[in-house]
Amino acid sequence: EHLVEYCKDNGIQVVAYSSFGPQSYIELNHPLAKNTPNLFHHDTIKQIANNHNVATSQVLLRWATQRGIAIIPKSSKKERLQDNLMIDEKLTLTHKELEAISKLNKNLRLNDPWDWLDGKFPIFA
C-alpha cells in the first residue's frame, strides 16, 4: 500500500501484475504460491461478488482499478475479455468493500526476481 501511495504522490502509474494471486506461480513450484490461499475462493471476495452479482475475478479487478491501479488481465475467452474491459462501468465497490479487500493484504511479492535467482538480481520497487 505504501508503494501505491508513493507512486500516486509522484505521478507514477502502478500496474497490477498477477491480480488474481498466485495461480501463475503454482505450476512453477514456487513455495510461497503453494501456501497462498486462492483469492477466487476467499470468503470476503465471494461475499462481495455475490452482493453485486458478478464474478470474483471482477471484484479483484475492480478493487485495483477503483484505486487507480492499471490492470493487465489475460484470458483465452472472448466473454471474459469483454467483461474485463467493462468492469469500471459494471461495478462500483463501496468504501467498506474496498477496505475489506485491502485488509486481505499479506505483503506477498510473487514476482520478485530475488526469489528466483538466488539473490543475484534484486528488485527494489
Kindly label every feature range from the protein language model.
Residues 1-125:
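Beta/alpha (TIM)-barrel catalytic core signal, keyed to glycine-rich beta->alpha loops juxtaposed to Asp/Glu
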